[in-house]
Amino acid sequence: EITTRLVGSEMCIRDRSDSPNWSMVYNRQALGKSLDYVMLMAYDQVGRTSPVAGPTATLPWVETSIKNTLQSVPAEKVILGMPLYMRVWYEAANGKDLPKDLADWPAAVTETAVEAGTGTKQAAAAKAAAKKPKLFVRTLTLADSQAVRNKYKSSVVWDNALGLYKLDVQLPEGRLKIWFEDDKSLKEKVKLIPQYHLGGASFWRKGFEPANFWQGFAKHELT
């Protein structure tokens, strides 16, 4: 009845809950029967309030989220939501966050740093471990992430088990950790859409993407 009355329009419904169990409190089966589409927000695997650094959306976690949702919602109604962001996690030994401007971030500590008077990588790590570091976290958009990768490119590695690139590098006053989302990681997630016969894709959020992003991913969006 609502669909008939709202021809040419859209209505987004967000169920309310004060439960600490997050989305599992929702009656997904009832929602799946009543709604045209159910948006599965497959991101924030590790949220910004976490006391421990972690990824935004690893491939195994996303696939598990899909499987759990399909137990109560028809596949053709499920829209896979994917992140156009990640988080910068910085464990600061000196209790101070990294500068706002990437250009002011320090270089990674290497064995050759002795010549510059900054000590060895092991010494820096020992200094960071001497007292419990303070964890700082900030959001990094897909559009801005390439500059960070370029700065620390020798330390960025692909994690096949997680389905994404990650950075774990020692800096002079702390440790920097980022689990990157990019074209490769998102394409791996997109493969799950036809695999599980889902209704389409969505991304959070518009404005976080780099130029020309939609040329490769727009065909997967719900239209």
Task: Locate each region found by the language model.
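Single conserved hydrophobic/aromatic residue that forms the stacking wall/gate
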Residues: 1-13
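Alpha-helical scaffolding within the catalytic cores
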Residues: 17-29, 63-68
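Aromatic- and acid-rich polysaccharide-binding/catalytic face
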Residues: 25-56
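Conserved, mostly hydrophobic/aromatic
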Residues: 38, 80, 193, 201
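Glycan-binding loop/region signatures in secreted carbohydrate-active enzymes
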Residues: 84-192, 221-223
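C-terminal functional modules
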Residues: 190, 196-197, 204-207
